[in-house]
């Protein structure tokens, strides 16, 4: 009991004798200039169009894009589709489409048809089916709701 009291007293004395340092607010410093939308699109198009890009790097680029607070432009989506086709990974291409569809959020009814309209020639050229063509846009084994009857 005495040792606990002594420790608490020592701690209180130490904090009162030692001056508290002034706290400086952290400042976030951004390096370089702000990137425009066109430069951003070109950077990712160039990333996906690199020679010798492998599946892991493609997945990393797609994951980075889908983690950002934006819907990728049709040019970037096409570049990602071509890259996944170059490494012969059609499943990756379909997942990329599904991720882009999911990024449309509550604007899915307007944005996703626009994206599909823009990338349909590329999809046909590469032979990549959409999620709707595969029938994976709705759950396969889902039961009808009792409230819909």
UniProtKB/Swiss-Prot annotation:
Protein name (record): Cytochrome c oxidase subunit 5A, mitochondrial
Quaternary structure and partners: Component of the cytochrome c oxidase (complex IV, CIV), a multisubunit enzyme composed of a catalytic core of 3 subunits and several supernumerary subunits. The complex exists as a monomer or a dimer and forms supercomplexes (SCs) in the inner mitochondrial membrane with ubiquinol-cytochrome c oxidoreductase (cytochrome b-c1 complex, complex III, CIII).
SUPFAM superfamilies named among the record's database cross-references: Cytochrome c oxidase subunit E
Gene: COX5A
Annotated GO MF terms: metal ion binding
InterPro entries: Cyt_c_oxidase_su5A/6 (IPR003204), Cyt_c_oxidase_su5A/6_sf (IPR036545)
The keyword Disulfide bond belongs to this UniProt entry's keyword annotation: no
CDD domains given in the database record: Cyt_c_Oxidase_Va
């Amino acid at each position: 009991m005495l040792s606990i009291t002594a420790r608490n007293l020592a701690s209180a004395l130490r904090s009162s004798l030692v001056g508290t340092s002034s706290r400086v607010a952290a400042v976030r410093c951004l390096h370089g200039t702000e990137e425009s939308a066109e430069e951003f699109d070109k950077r990712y198009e160039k990333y996906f169009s690199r020679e010798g890009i492998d599946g892991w790097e493609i997945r990393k680029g797609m994951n980075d894009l889908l983690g950002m607070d934006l819907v990728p432009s049709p040019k970037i989506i096409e570049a990602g589709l071509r890259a996944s086709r170059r490494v012969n990974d059609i499943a990756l291409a379909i997942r990329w489409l599904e991720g882009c569809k999911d990024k449309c959020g509550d604007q899915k009814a307007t944005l996703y048809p626009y994206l599909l309209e823009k990338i349909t020639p590329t999809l046909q050229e590469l032979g990549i089916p959409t999620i709707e063509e595969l029938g994976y846009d709705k759950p396969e084994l889902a039961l009808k709701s009792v409230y819909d009857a």
